[in-house]
Amino acid sequence: MNIEEFTSGLAEKGISLSPRQLEQFELYYDMLVEWNEKINLTSITEKKEVYLKHFYDSITAAFYVDFNQVNTICDVGAGAGFPSLPIKICFPHLHVTIVDSLNKRITFLEKLSEALQLENTTFCHDRAETFGQRKDVRESYDIVTARAVARLSVLSELCLPLVKKNGLFVALKAASAEEELNAGKKAITTLGGELENIHSFKLPIEESDRNIMVIRKIKNTPKKYPRKPGTPNKSPIEG
């Protein structure tokens, strides 16, 4: 996906990028490739691939969720900043918090945010299980996002405790959504969520399957969740 395809593809979905925003994506790409030589951020480094599989793919969440109507986002296990930072570039009013367990990645994200002059971005070096028990952040975000970091039953335990009541947990997944959803139903219900929608589509150009799961927080998460670090992965809430 070249820059023209990227720009026109987003414009078709009602997202118009200014010259400044396009510059931010260019700098994001340059820094991603530069830092990737020092720390492992991504296996995808070819420019057209990054624009399609990282930038465009991240922004697809905004095709189905109206980010103009929310203020706060938390991104769990964002790695090199996906999906939240491409979304932040498109919707500059957002207050974005990223939680990642690897300090090197947090350092990259801080430097990146500074270079892109992104305001209202917070980067936390923490495990999602620990972060989700913090009283100052628990059940405080309009939207919590995660992109392919773990299966849905595990992700729900890491993300739903952070979503405020009536807010959304938005999971960006490749294929196998139905299978994951069946295994994750018990976790979603236990943690106070309810599936609102699954949006299935194909990424342009390469035609690979994508799914965006939108889960509404309808009641408070029981205090015992998330459990201690490692437990959600070892013993997921599955029926």
From Swiss-Prot:
Belongs to the methyltransferase superfamily. RNA methyltransferase RsmG family. GO terms for molecular function: rRNA (guanine-N7-)-methyltransferase activity. Keywords: Cytoplasm, Methyltransferase, rRNA processing, S-adenosyl-L-methionine, Transferase. PANTHER family: S-ADENOSYL-L-METHIONINE-DEPENDENT METHYLTRANSFERASES SUPERFAMILY PROTEIN. Coiled coil: none annotated. InterPro entries: rRNA_ssu_MeTfrase_G (IPR003682), SAM-dependent_MTases_sf (IPR029063). Disruption phenotype: Low-level streptomycin resistance. Its EC number is 2.1.1.-. The keyword Cytoplasm applies. This is Ribosomal RNA small subunit methyltransferase G. It comes from the Bacteria. It is an enzyme of class 2 (transferase). The lineage of its organism: Bacteria, Bacillati, Bacillota, Bacilli, Bacillales. GO terms for cellular component: cytosol. It is found in: Cytoplasm.
